[in-house]
């Protein structure tokens, strides 16, 4: 074999990130909003999924806005999974913004501004406009360049459809667009007359035999029918936040790319609201209320809850879905306790969807789906042991053991994860219960001891007791 024949071909590996909820494709409901047992990556939680399906249906119809839904349940019961399923079910047309309750705390902008931006990111505006386009197959292009090499270029293009053929004179700007898109004879193109934008749709089927080999990106399309000049309705979908950023004088549209939007004045927002409502009255635009999902909502403080009370009553408000795993706990920023750490007046505006713990059978099904998602072949006995670990500890811990067990399996050059692999990673990585047990056993060896309830009420820790042992003389000196 000669040197020229020794060619090594390597396939380019496509990197796909596998997230905690990347296996979810929707809510797993049928046409009458009944939950299937296992569908679209969702398992169990039939009542919660059915309730979420009703909310999705209402959002699709666009009839409701400013409603608030709370997903409440114990940890590892699929609250975030239901929210991800809602986002997948709504599709890309409906704005869906996801954020955590702790994301609003920043030194650059106020808490209410962060919430306001999140709310306006969740409201879409469909703007309709009619444009005049020229659509046809390129028969011939002639471009005349100046002899000196500098100056304006002029040219002609011949376009045809199945019914007609016409010549067009080209200006310098259109010629540059043609050269940028690499337009040649046989291409099917569209030219926007208003903006001068040239779009290449593909190659004509009549030119399919021009080349013996073509790249994968080459697309063959039919020659257009009818007139060359057509009127076409174009729909642009933008969010209110994007319109805010573009109209904010301090930053302008470049802030859309940098992400550094800063605080936007309320006057700008009011003007945009009035303009969008005016467009809606004229039939130029449609308002599409989306969904704002706030995870760990108990991390918001009393000022944020007060702001949400007013924001939810606005006409320009999306459907807000919140999730929390807290029971009766303290409202952040106050000394009062309430259910889920949310004030009673805001709870009164919510409808609450409860999630229940998964059964052992459902946990096994979830682990099986995660094994498929992570390309891990697991023996049935190993899956049974992993299910038992999940019921004794937590579902998240068991899911994390799948990847580590798969790595141990590959280390011994096997293709199937067995019980020994699962036992090995279980002994290597501690769960929360075993870790707490070790900490209680060896807590005196650690730097700080456990804080008792009495110490917590006084706001002191184990290492602060010595500071309270003030002598009588010191106390008198402090009084004077």
From Swiss-Prot:
Q: Does the keyword Nucleotide-binding apply?
A: yes
Which terms does the UniProt entry file under GO BP? chromatin organization; DNA repair; negative regulation of canonical Wnt signaling pathway; regulation of cell population proliferation
Coiled-coil segments, which residues?
Answer: none
Q: Which SMART domains match?
A: AAA
- Enumerate the UniProt keywords alphabetically: ATP-binding, Chromatin regulator, DNA damage, DNA repair, Helicase, Hydrolase, Nucleotide-binding, Nucleus, Repressor, Transcription, Transcription regulation
- Tell me where it mainly resides: nucleus
Spell out the subcellular localization from the entry: Nucleus
Reactions catalysed according to its record: ATP + H2O = ADP + phosphate + H(+)
How is this protein annotated for GO cellular component? NuA4 histone acetyltransferase complex; nucleus
- Which residues are involved in binding ATP? 73-80
The record's EC number reads: 3.6.4.12
One GO molecular-function entry: transcription corepressor activity
Q: Which InterPro entries match?
A: AAA+_ATPase (IPR003593), P-loop_NTPase (IPR027417), RuvB-like (IPR027238), RuvB-like_C (IPR041048), RuvBL1/2_DNA/RNA_bd_dom (IPR042487), TIP49_P-loop (IPR010339)
Top-level class of the enzyme under EC nomenclature: hydrolase
Q: How does it assemble?
A: Forms homohexameric rings. May form a dodecamer with rept made of two stacked hexameric rings. Component of the chromatin remodeling Ino80 complex.
Task: List, alphabetically, the PANTHER family matched.
Answer: RUVB-RELATED REPTIN AND PONTIN (PTHR11093)
Q: Which family does it belong to?
A: Belongs to the RuvB family.
Q: What does the record give as the function of this protein?
A: Acts as a transcriptional coactivator in Wg signaling caused by altered arm signaling. Pont and rept interfere antagonistically with nuclear arm signaling function, and are required to enhance or reduce arm activity, respectively. Also an essential cofactor for the normal function of Myc; required for cellular proliferation and growth.
Q: Name it.
A: RuvB-like helicase 2
Q: Which organism is it from?
A: Drosophila pseudoobscura pseudoobscura (Fruit fly)
State the taxonomy lineage: Eukaryota, Metazoa, Ecdysozoa, Arthropoda, Hexapoda
């Amino acid at each position: 074999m000669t040197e020229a024949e020794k060619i090594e071909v390597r396939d380019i590996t496509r990197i796909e990130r596998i997230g905690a909820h990347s296996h979810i494709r929707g809510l797993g409901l049928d046409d009458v909003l009944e939950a299937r047992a296992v569908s679209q990556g969702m398992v169990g939680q039939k009542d919660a999924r059915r309730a979420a399906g009703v909310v999705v249906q209402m959002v699709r119809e666009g009839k409701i806005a400013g409603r608030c839904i709370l997903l409440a349940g114990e940890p590892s019961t699929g609250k975030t999974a239901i929210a991800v399923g809602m986002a997948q079910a709504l599709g890309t047309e409906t704005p869906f913004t996801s954020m955590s309750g702790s994301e609003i705390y920043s030194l650059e902008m106020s808490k209410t501004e962060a919430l306001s931006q999140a709310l306006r990111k969740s409201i879409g505006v469909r703007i309709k406009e009619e444009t005049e386009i020229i659509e046809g197959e390129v028969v011939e292009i002639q471009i005349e360049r100046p002899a000196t090499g500098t100056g304006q270029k002029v040219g002609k293009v011949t376009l045809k459809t199945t019914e007609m053929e016409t010549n067009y004179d080209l200006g310098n700007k259109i010629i540059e667009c043609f050269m940028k898109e690499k337009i040649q004879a046989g291409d099917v193109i569209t030219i926007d007359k208003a903006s001068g934008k040239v779009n290449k749709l593909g190659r004509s089927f009549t030119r399919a035999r021009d080349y013996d080999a073509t790249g994968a990106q080459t697309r063959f399309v039919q020659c257009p029918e009818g007139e060359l000049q057509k009127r076409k309705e174009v729909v642009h979908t933008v969010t209110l936040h994007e319109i805010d950023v573009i109209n904010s004088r301090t930053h302008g549209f470049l802030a859309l790319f940098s992400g550094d939007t800063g605080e936007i004045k309320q006057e700008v927002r009011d003007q945009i609201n009035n303009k969008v409502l005016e467009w809606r009255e004229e039939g130029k635009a449609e308002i599409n209320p989306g969904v704002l999902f706030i995870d760990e909502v108990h991390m918001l403080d009393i000022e944020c809850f007060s702001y949400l009370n007013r924001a939810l009553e606005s006409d320009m408000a999306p459907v807000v879905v919140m999730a929390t795993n807290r029971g009766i706990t303290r409202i952040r920023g106050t000394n009062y306790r309430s259910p889920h750490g949310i004030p009673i007046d805001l709870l009164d505006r919510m409808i609450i969807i409860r999630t229940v713990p998964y059964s052992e059978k459902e946990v096994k099904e979830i682990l099986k789906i995660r094994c498929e998602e992570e390309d891990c072949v697991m023996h049935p006995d190993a899956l049974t042991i992993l299910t038992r670990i999940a019921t004794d500890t937590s579902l998240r811990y068991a899911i994390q053991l799948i990847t580590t067990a798969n790595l141990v399996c590959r280390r011994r050059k096997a293709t199937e994860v067995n019980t020994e692999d699962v036992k090995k990673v279980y002994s290597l990585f501690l769960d929360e219960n075993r870790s707490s047990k070790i900490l209680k056993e060896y807590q005196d060896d650690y730097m700080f001891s456990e804080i008792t309830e009495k110490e917590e009420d006084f706001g002191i820790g184990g290492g602060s007791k010595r500071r309270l042992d003030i002598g009588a003389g010191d106390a008198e000196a402090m009084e004077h």
